């Protein structure tokens, strides 16, 4: 399929090459290739995209990114630097690339202002944030965005009419030591990423964020970070138990309603037709978006799987590009009508 849109595609600042190399050594079997791919924007990426039928990519800063910086001033300065940098890069090939804003999430008003700057000045397509913001004197605290203090930020998202991508980050500090240190091979895609994001997004559901901001659009990667597979059980306990005990005060709709109206999932890093079909049955093809998770995953694995998956033509087009066109209000790009 030509003209696919991919929207969980990472980059890193070239000046952090050594840090990126060290980070890559923790998970990549070819750290040097990873460094080259994640710091490149307009050459290697486009070559891969041309070969595999990806017409447009929305780029975002690699995890853990700014969410790993617990000093608010340093975090904000880096977010601005990243946004200014990627704005210059995507301007080279605007028919191939867009960008998500990188945000320091220490202060909701500051985050809202930076998002507005990126959308209004640069035309960014929304924001991607790597789960909770590390905070406190030693970085061991976590800031969640699922309480009323963050209403000013979510209101800005809806005013700008742009989505927010809740991406994972690695567990740190006390949480890492108590839960993951003795189970280090479960950190990341095998388990910890889904734990973090599903907790955060379901917290937004139960704490009434979507009821207060009914037009808010949230994206979850990796086919929904396990939530679609627990949809029946979550719905059963919310509706038949928790709401009778008080959840109804803050959570007015069903979990299925929120997935139909506020939550999207992507195929990033999860290239299974069986799993995709299950998610289509639970949340519908209208709420699923193609993505790769490059360079942590490859264009070839993602695209060859998707192009050859047993899907009907309508669903392939929806997931591959048409849903994203509508969500991000995209104009013409390479092979957008192929």
Curated annotation (Swiss-Prot):
Disulfide bonds: none annotated. Its EC number is 4.1.1.46. GO terms for molecular function: hydrolase activity; o-pyrocatechuate decarboxylase activity. It is an enzyme of class 4 (lyase). It comes from the Eukaryota. The lineage of its organism: Eukaryota, Fungi, Dikarya, Ascomycota, Pezizomycotina. It comes from Aspergillus oryzae (strain ATCC 42149 / RIB 40). InterPro entries: ACMSD (IPR032465), Amidohydro-rel (IPR006680), Metal_Hydrolase (IPR032466). This is 2,3-dihydroxybenzoate decarboxylase. Keywords: Decarboxylase, Lyase.
